[in-house]
């Protein structure tokens, strides 16, 4: 009486990694995600290595996890991996209060984000 096993949502030539609870706004995280979208995995890692954005280290860690998932769990060739998707979602928002003038208080929003990276193995083109 158990539920039927759920089919794999990704094709056989793809692997993914998800980073949750990243303490940065989704808008700022999306700036870094745009850098790696559609790039080869090795080039994307190099871009993140030398990026000056604070969140680039967490994005690099998530990309390395996706590459490791592709290699270890799905037996894909690391040299042929391309970042197929890199998308950002909203996380929770912590609300804090800061004192303002005349005994009032103002809200401060501290947003969190989620990052999903999907890598795909592409076949190397035959050079003519």
Curated annotation (Swiss-Prot):
PANTHER family: CHLOROPLAST 50S RIBOSOMAL PROTEIN L22-RELATED, LARGE RIBOSOMAL SUBUNIT PROTEIN UL22M. Signal peptide: none annotated. GO terms for cellular component: cytosolic large ribosomal subunit. Belongs to the universal ribosomal protein uL22 family. HAMAP family: Ribosomal_uL22_B. The lineage of its organism: Bacteria, Pseudomonadati, Pseudomonadota, Alphaproteobacteria, Hyphomicrobiales. Keywords: Ribonucleoprotein, Ribosomal protein, RNA-binding, rRNA-binding. One of its GO terms (molecular function) is rRNA binding. GO terms for biological process: translation. Gene3D superfamilies: Ribosomal protein L22/L17. Coiled coil: none annotated. This is Large ribosomal subunit protein uL22. Part of the 50S ribosomal subunit. It comes from Nitrobacter hamburgensis (strain DSM 10229 / NCIMB 13809 / X14). Transmembrane segments: none annotated. InterPro entries: Ribosomal_uL22 (IPR001063), Ribosomal_uL22_bac/chlpt-type (IPR005727), Ribosomal_uL22_bac/org-type (IPR047867), Ribosomal_uL22_sf (IPR036394). This protein binds specifically to 23S rRNA; its binding is stimulated by other ribosomal proteins, e.g. L4, L17, and L20. It is important during the early stages of 50S assembly. It makes multiple contacts with different domains of the 23S rRNA in the assembled 50S subunit and ribosome. The globular domain of the protein is located near the polypeptide exit tunnel on the outside of the subunit, while an extended beta-hairpin is found that lines the wall of the exit tunnel in the center of the 70S ribosome. It holds the Pfam family Ribosomal_L22.
């Amino acid at each position: 009486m158990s539920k039927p096993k759920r089919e794999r949502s990704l094709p056989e030539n793809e692997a993914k990694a998800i980073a949750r609870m990243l303490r940065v706004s989704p808008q700022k995280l999306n700036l870094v995600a745009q850098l790696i979208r559609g790039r080869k995995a090795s080039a994307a890692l190099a871009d993140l290595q030398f990026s000056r954005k604070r969140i680039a280290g967490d994005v690099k860690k998530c990309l390395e996890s996706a590459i490791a998932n592709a290699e270890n769990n799905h037996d894909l060739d690391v040299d042929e991996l391309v970042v197929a998707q890199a998308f950002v979602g909203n996380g929770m928002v912590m609300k804090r209060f800061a004192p303002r003038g005349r005994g009032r208080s103002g809200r401060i929003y501290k947003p969190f984000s989620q990052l999903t990276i999907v890598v795909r193995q592409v076949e190397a083109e035959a050079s003519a």
